[in-house]
A protein has these predicted regions:
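Active-site-proximal loop/turn and secondary-structure-junction residues that shape catalytic pockets
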Residues: 45-49, 70-71, 91-92, 112-114, ...
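A charged N-terminal "starter" segment
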Residues: 1-130, 172-178, 205, 209-212, ...
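Conserved, mostly hydrophobic/aromatic
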Residues: 23, 46, 68, 100, ...
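Structured core elements
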Residues: 63, 86, 107-109, 133-135, ...
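Charged (often Lys/Glu-rich) extended helix/loop segments that serve as interaction or gating elements
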Residues: 2, 8, 244-246, 253-404
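Short acidic, glycine/serine/threonine-rich loops at helix termini
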Residues: 54, 77, 97-102, 119-122, ...
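Active-site loop/helix belt of alpha/beta enzymes
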Residues: 139-277, 367, 378
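Conserved active-site and cofactor/substrate-binding residues in soluble primary-metabolism enzymes
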Residues: 2, 18-25, 48, 114, ...
Length: 404
């Protein structure tokens, strides 16, 4: 059992704590699942882009799935090789495209004809040939939260089969484009295998047609999205996921690219917070803690439910349902409703579980609240991997006040 009391002697709440052993094992599980085929596991930085986490993954020969030039530079800073980086996203600016081409990453995932032409124009101005992949929208329901579903035709991501074919043929004829991959990503937090099987089969068929037309494909990018069990849901077995994708690619000599994020880091992370007050209103019990929605947005944004446990000794205290809420001035600043917890006192400590993904990476300074301290548990030792922001950091980049 981890000794939290030692942490509290040196670190004030709230803070994030990541178990690096869990991150390492989760990544190695992906490498093992796809070992029967040429593959590249590109960790999705959007889930958690802390440099220490990226450095850990770089040492394991991870690639990177990036959606901004900032993420690309983070990946490079952490030691991930350019030839293992892919650049995705529906809205790449000309500046980002130019910088990316100069960095000579593996390829850019293209999401529209206009973007393709922009890449071609910039590549021509640089006198180079841009390696590209085209993201195909297979019009398949991922059966996940609508905010993170990306594979239906009404979603903003990717292009349909007909337009994809036109884009590939355009790229094939261009002196400044090199189409080397097909790509799809139908959504995040997938808990069912059938949508990914259907998408893999559909896009594999398209890939075979493209190869028959003389397009020299080398990669088959299946995106990411395997879900995590937040509420004891049954999840996809990684081995089954990999095998079904491998089956869909029979007859195709392509390197598989997979872009996991959540399933690599989610279960490694905890948000440790302490009780400020208890109150009752209209016979409802509230436990008010020092972490807020600005620190961890998922419950407010997605109505996500993360288990909460008490780590302060509380034996013998009466247990009753309560809402665990933060100090931010929003009614949505609620971590969990109706959770059964013992009577709590100011200073008691709680742990919000499985927050390693889309926790710190989505944090903000809303209500002028500094971003949190982040700690790593590695080889039985605790170290700081992000300092807590000081109050002065809230306005450090602002200008315009004389004499301040």
């Amino acid at each position: 059992m981890f000794n939290y009391e030692e942490l509290f002697q040196t670190h004030k709440t709230p803070f994030y704590l990541y178990d690096f052993g869990k991150i390492k094992q989760a990544f190695l599980n992906y490498k093992e699942a796809f070992k029967g085929r040429k593959s590249l596991i590109c960790y999705a930085l959007k889930a958690n882009s802390n440099l220490s986490i990226l450095s850990l993954l770089a040492k394991l020969e991870s690639g990177a799935d990036c959606v901004s030039i900032g993420e690309i530079y983070r990946a490079l800073k952490a030691g991930i090789k350019p030839y293992r980086i892919v650049f995705s996203g529906v809205g790449k600016s000309e500046f980002e495209i130019e910088q990316t081409l100069k960095l000579n990453i593996l390829f850019l995932n293209v999401e529209s004809f206009m973007e393709l032409q922009t890449i071609e124009k910039i590549a021509q101005s640089l006198g180079i040939k841009a390696r590209i992949s085209i993201r195909i929208n297979p019009n398949i329901d991922a059966k996940t939260h609508p905010y993170i579903s990306t594979g239906l035709k009404e979603n903003k991501f990717g292009v349909g089969e007909k337009e994809a074919l036109e884009m590939f043929l355009w790229a094939k004829k261009s002196a400044f484009l090199e189409p080397i991959s097909v790509h799809f990503h139908i959504g995040s937090q997938l808990l069912e295998l059938e949508p990914i099987i259907e998408a893999s089969q559909k896009v594999a068929k398209i890939a075979k047609s493209l190869i028959a037309l003389g397009i020299d494909l080398r990669f088959f990018d299946v995106g990411g999205g395997i879900g995590v069990s937040y509420e004891n849901e049954e999840t996809i077995k990684l081995y089954d996921y990999a095998q079904r994708i491998l089956n869909a690619l029979q007859g195709l000599d392509l390197t598989i690219i997979c872009e996991p994020g959540r399933s690599i880091v989610a279960e490694s992370g905890e948000l440790i917070t302490q009780v400020l007050y208890e109150k009752k209103a209209q016979n409802k019990r509230f436990v008010i803690v020092d972490a807020g929605m600005n620190d961890f947005l998922r419950p407010s944004l997605y109505h996500a439910k993360h288990a909460i446990r008490v780590i302060t000794p509380s034996k013998g205290r009466k247990i009753s349902p309560c809402d665990v809420v933060g100090p931010v001035c929003e009614s949505s600043d609620t971590f969990l409703k109706g959770v059964h917890l013992p009577e709590l006192e100011p200073g008691d400590k709680l742990v919000i579980e499985k927050v390693g993904a889309y926790g710190s990476s989505m944090a903000s300074q809303y209500n002028s609240r500094p971003k949190l301290l982040e700690l790593a548990l590695e080889d039985q030792k605790i170290r700081v991997i992000r300092k807590r922001e000081a109050l002065e950091d809230l306005w450090r980049l602002e200008e315009g006040l004389k004499g301040v």
